[in-house]
Amino acid sequence: MTGIKFDQGKAPLSLIDPRFTEEVARVLAIGEQKYGRANWQGLKIERLLDAVKRHVLELEKSNDHDDETGLHHAAHAASGLMFIFWLLNNRPTSDDRRWSAAVPGVREQRGSVQPVPDSEEGLDMQPVPAPSPSRSKKRAYSTGTIADVQKLISGWADRTFPDRTIGEAILKLKKELAELDTASYLDAGEFADVAILLLDIAQLAGIDIATAVANKMAINERRVWQRLEDGTHQHVIDGGRTDGVDPIIRVAMLPTDPTGSHLCVVCGQRFGSEDDRASHYTTTHGDRKP
């Protein structure tokens, strides 16, 4: 028996790469988290065209992935084109294309989904509104607690690199640190690469990074710091000596009364380097092993 189905006129969806569809869906999901559901329906065509052009420009510069989301610029551009397609078919009043002779100019305030009428002065600049707290909390990749960001990073890494190891992640971190150095510490994307790897390594090691940082900062707040000759800083202890190599410990048992009670005295000395400590020990104790 031969099956018959009339598909004439139907869209050949098999021509679309499903991975591209998934990438666009991820862009849309992040957009909803960042701006709210269907926020784009209040935008104007010209604004969306600007966004699409920016992503295409990044592709022309061989920058394939968006720094903020980590997703492909092609998927970002496609999502913007989809919005434009929908608005042109369903909300023709959104069509404010600058170079269309049939459309009067509409001035829109950036950062808002509603057009702002011109002031009486005509060309007066409109103030840019500060983002509301509720909106800022929805940002997916740039706000939240350290624990939130660590969870976000590890979730992505688990899906993308499920077989990664701590050693491999540390090796990658070293490479990213070199790239950050090459960029003269001016590239936000390189900073983000280093931070992402640090948080993922901590997650792989089972470290609650938020608690670890809080505990360490409590210690740092109590320390006194001094600048060293190489420009770095080291915390200072014991009346001004800097922490260096672990100290040599001396223990002495001193009698305190005729009954035989003793007082244990522990003394230590710190050294600036391992060679200094070894030299001091040899001078004091000869070849006897500690």
From Swiss-Prot:
Domain of life the protein comes from: Viruses
GO molecular function: hydrolase activity; nucleotide binding; zinc ion binding
Catalytic reaction list: dGTP + H2O = dGMP + diphosphate + H(+); dATP + H2O = dAMP + diphosphate + H(+)
Keywords of this entry: Cobalt, Hydrolase, Metal-binding, Nucleotide-binding, Zinc, Zinc-finger
Disulfide bridges in this chain: none
Pathway: Purine metabolism
Family annotation (InterPro entries): dATP/dGTP_diPOhydrolase_N, dATP/dGTP_dipphydrolase_MazZ, Znf_C2H2_type
EC number assigned by the record: 3.6.1.9
Cofactor: Co(2+)
Zn finger (C2H2-type) location: 262-285
Region of interest (Disordered), residue spans: 103-141
Coiled-coil positions: none
Family named by the database record: Belongs to the Caudovirales dATP/dGTP diphosphohydrolase family.
Function: Catalyzes the hydrolysis of dGTP into dGMP, which is needed among other for the first step of biosynthesis of dZTP (2-amino-2'-deoxyadenosine-5'-triphosphate).
Name of the featured protein: dATP/dGTP diphosphohydrolase
Organism: Salmonella phage PMBT28
